[in-house]
Amino acid sequence: METGHVENTDTPLVFSLPGVNFRHFAGESDFPGMVAILAARFQAGKAERLSTLEDIRNQFANLANCDPARDYLFAESDGKMVGYASVTWEQEEDTQDRVFFLTVNVFPDWEDKGLDGILLDWACAHAREISAESPRPEQDKMDFFTMLSDQHQVALLELTGFSPVRYFFRMRRDLDTLPNDPLPKGIELLPITPRDYRALW
């Protein structure tokens, strides 16, 4: 889902939820908590795949345009991580405009308490803050990937001003019934070799 132009704001946001503390990235000690949240969301049909500890380590080892110390916000209750949000961005080559990618993940039983809304507000505000440094902040956009099965998050995003711009579908084809049609004359199938990579990509 995508929202319109990113607008800078000097209005500070106050994050307050009874029993919840908000903090920034503490290091690799945060990874198990993130995995637990993502696993709970996967089990509830709110995540596309089950992420492992190694997945999270690899993700953080290859971050681009993201400083975990300032671009992640974590929520804790009774010393346990219950949610987090992040902001990363990419710059389009032709226009130099930035697209900010926002994520918000909370335990499903924390959604009705408003935690995800608070984290989304922070992510949007933080994207605007970073956008003020871009070449054309008035053209920057925010992007958020979610699943249609997560109707709570879809409704929250729409309430915040996001609207769908594209859909992805996972489809399966029965390989036993594929037609055995001959290739057109002059066309042949060849294996891909390393020397072909540049031309293909």
Stretches found by the model and what they are:
Residues 1-14, 89-187, 193:
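Acyl-donor-binding surface of acyltransferase catalytic domains
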Residues 16-17, 43:
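Anionic, Ser/Thr-rich low-complexity intrinsically disordered regions
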Residues 21-34, 188-201:
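A short beta-loop-alpha structural element at the N-terminal edge
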Residues 23-28, 39-133, 143:
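Conserved donor-binding loop and adjoining core beta-sheet/short helix segment
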Residues 32-34, 57-59, 152-154, 199:
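Short, solvent-exposed polar/charged micro-motifs at secondary-structure junctions
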Residues 37-40, 159:
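Residues within well-ordered alpha-helical secondary structure of globular protein domains
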